[in-house]
Amino acid sequence: DSVRRELEAQWQFFADAELHPEHIDGHEHCHVFPVICDVVRDLVVGHQIPVVRLPGEKGGPFVPRYFTRLLLGYLRGSRPKFWKDTQCLTMPFYGISLVGRVDDHQEWRQLLARIADPISMVMVHPGIETPGDELHGDSFPGSRQAELDMILSVEWRDLLKELHVQPISFKECVKELQTNPSA
C-alpha cells in the first residue's frame, strides 16, 4: 500500500506540473520486482502510460553483472507478456552489464552486436564532472565524464556506423514502437 501511495504521489507531482510521463522504468528496474510490478502495472493502466522499459540483457555472462541480469531476467515483471493486458508497449533496455565500464569501446562492440531487437534502448549516464562539488555528486560506479567523452568521440560514431546502429531520440523511439508494435 505504501508503494502505491508513493507512486500516486509522484504521479500527482508530474500532473501538477502539467507533465505526462511517456514511460515507466523504476530505479535499478525496481518496477519489475515481485509485488511492486503489480502496483506499477495498475499505475500504467490507470494513467495510460504508453511504454514500459524492461531490462533486456541477453547473451553471454559478463562478470560482475551476470547475477543482476540473471535475477532481472527471471522476474515475471521483466517479461513483455506480464504487461500485455495493460495495452502499453514494452521496450528492451540494455547496458546493465556495462556499469562502471561504459567508456570501453570493446565492451560496447560486444553488447551492440548481441542486440537483435530492431528498437531498443541502451543505458549511459554521461555528465560533466565538477571537482570539489560535494553537493551535486553521486555514487555512480563509473566516470560520467568518461562516458560523455566516449559518446562524443569519433570512435563511437564509427562503431555505430560499422554495426548499423542508428541513434534516435526517445520520442522517435516511442513513435516507431506505436507505429510498428512488433518491432
PLM region spans:
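Terminal accessory/targeting
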Residues: 1-23, 34-183
